[in-house]
Amino acid sequence: MGDVMSEKIKIFENPKAKLVRSENYNFNFNKQSGLFMRWGKTEDDDPIVGLPEILDIEVSEICHGVNNVPCPFCYKSNVGYKGRNMSLETFKKVIDNFFFFNSEGVSMTPLTQIALGIGDIDSNPDLKDMILYARERGIIPNITINGDRLTDEWVEFFAKNLGAIAVSIYDKDISYNAIKKLTDAGMTQVNVHFMLATESLEKAYEIMNDTKTDPRLEKLNALVLLSLKQKGRGEHFTRLSQEEFTKLVEYGMSNNIRLGFDSCGQQKFIKAVEKHSNFKELEQLSEPCESGLFSTYINVEGKFFPCSFSEGTEGWEDGIDCACDDFDFLKDVWFSDRLVEWRKKLLGNCRNCPIYEV
């Protein structure tokens, strides 16, 4: 990452925590609980741009779906064995390129965690080694799965090495059984991921009710509702209106259901709770789109895009290669003209998605 940031930003780290300190950008990250706090010049100041704190990295495109039925709204349009796997060599190069040497000659990174993107749980034979390498480098690995093909061996490995795991709901029995296996193995950060659209709204209410009644979900951490981006097979789905979204949020909160939302839907969430008694607290806990501001995405080829949904869109028809030698992430990506231009669009749109109507 070069030497520029090592002079201006200090990173302190031990097995329990990572701290970043500078004049205008600071954060505390608890590696054990996942608690994260960020501030600027003062504790009341929110920095506009920082460093990459979270890395979403696609390690496989191969996905047969659940019971060999592809997901009908997959924005990547992944199908069977037609996809590619990221090699372990590429993965290591990408991770290593997020590190820099401080003034004491210690290799450090602002990354707190990586989210591994995969279809079939067993599609990439190097997945375990990738997770172990992230751990070796002091970065907490997380993953999203669909619950299919989850053997006891995978459960044991995930429980030992992941910080958190999300289970997408396609087939309820398969997903709920997977959640129970993972929580029974001692994992406390197990979430449900579910994509919201007009076509999936009824099932969203069904899952919310299940979190209160199905014993397999007794130790579930939260139900995370994801916003529809009309890309790939998702083009054929209908985005939820603000009215429908607000009703859903109100139902969840009134029934004490632990809900979470992706940053793409933050603006809708804020409108949904604007009359709530603890609005200020809810607003403080939510964050709008952070792509290219605090988070990054690397695809299966090792190429950078602001987020996975921006891949192939105008200005990002091709990404920036992050797996090459003699690479400086700060110079070649973080402060590149392309990413600076992206930030202008995102910030100029009040951190609402500049690509999709969410």
Predicted segments with their positions:
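Canonical Radical SAM [4Fe-4S] cluster-binding loop centered on the CxxxCxxC motif
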Residues: 45-93, 307-309, 314
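The −1 position to Zn-ligating cysteines in a subset of zinc-ribbon hairpins
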Residues: 62, 70-73, 288, 349, ...
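Short, acidic, Ser/Thr-enriched surface-loop or helix-capping motifs
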Residues: 31, 47, 298-304
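C-terminal accessory region of radical SAM enzymes
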Residues: 243-280, 303, 307-358
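A short acidic, helix-capping loop that chelates divalent metal ions and anchors anionic groups
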Residues: 80-82, 231-236
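Short, small/polar residue-rich loop motifs at catalytic or cofactor-binding pockets
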Residues: 289-293
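Radical SAM/AdoMet-radical enzyme domain recognition
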Residues: 88-118, 124-227
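N-terminal [4Fe-4S]-dependent radical SAM core
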Residues: 2-58, 279-282
